[in-house]
């Protein structure tokens, strides 16, 4: 989490783009280093703090929860605040470029632009079709995964956030080639970015 160390590393390679696949705790530090080095930025997940009990962060978080209408620890506001800095520097910052978020938003934007006159509802269904042979295994960092599934779920309805207790809405879905899976409504960052960029849905 040292901007100068990151700058030294970036400057030693002189890339056009830094692809951040570190933990989301590092997002802002890496964005700061990219700005300092004049390098474009891309990540796969939005920022969240490592220490959610830090009083300074907690005060900002409580205010944001009231304004946004959801209480998950992760949201795009921290990174969207960098938009003007990157624009002024003539740089690009692509946020959430994994599968979800990432590909899911690209599919939705493409469908809205090329396939449909109107879209009333977007449901994003994501399942793990693999089997690691363990009773518990995640596709990414276990701590982040547990934070996601233990946070209140949320969805947007009529332009407003609706928050629900964690894993309180469940449905079954039969996926081609994977089979029937239990699905739970979770809060996830693509809901926030889709709500901002496709406001009529």
Cite the ranges covered by each PLM segment.
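Acidic active-site catalytic centers that drive phospho-/nucleotidyl reactions
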Residues: 1, 20, 43
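Conserved Rossmann-fold cofactor-binding substructure of NAD(P)-dependent oxidoreductases
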Residues: 2-15, 22, 26
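Short glycine-/small-residue-rich flexible loop motifs, especially phosphate/cofactor-binding loops
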Residues: 7, 31, 83, 152, ...
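Structured catalytic core of nucleotide-sugar glycosyltransferases
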Residues: 10, 17, 41-44
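Active-site-adjacent beta-strand anchor residues
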Residues: 20, 98, 184
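Glycine-/Pro-rich loop/turn segments that contact NAD(P) or position catalytic residues
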Residues: 24-27, 31-140
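C-terminal catalytic/substrate-binding lobe primarily of soluble NAD(P)-dependent oxidoreductases
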Residues: 113-201
């Amino acid at each position: 989490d040292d901007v100068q160390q990151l700058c030294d590393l970036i400057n030693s390679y002189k890339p056009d783009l830094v692809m951040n696949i570190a933990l989301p705790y590092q997002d802002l530090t890496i964005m700061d280093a990219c700005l300092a080095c004049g390098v474009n930025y891309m990540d796969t997940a939005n920022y969240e703090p490592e220490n959610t009990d830090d009083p300074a962060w907690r005060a900002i978080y409580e205010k944001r929860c009231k304004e946004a209408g959801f209480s998950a620890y992760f949201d795009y506001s921290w990174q969207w605040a960098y938009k003007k800095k990157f624009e002024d520097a003539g740089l690009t910052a692509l946020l959430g470029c994994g599968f979800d978020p990432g590909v899911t938003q690209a599919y939705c934007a493409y469908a809205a632009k090329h396939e449909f006159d109107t879209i009333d509802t977007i449901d994003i269904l994501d399942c793990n079709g693999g089997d690691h042979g363990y009773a518990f295994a995640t596709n990414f960092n276990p701590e982040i995964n547990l934070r996601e599934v233990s946070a209140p779920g949320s969805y947007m309805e009529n332009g407003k956030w609706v928050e629900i207790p964690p894993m309180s809405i469940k449905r079954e879905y039969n996926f081609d080639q994977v089979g029937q899976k239990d699905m739970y409504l979770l809060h996830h960052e693509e809901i926030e970015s889709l709500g901002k960029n496709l406001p009529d849905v």
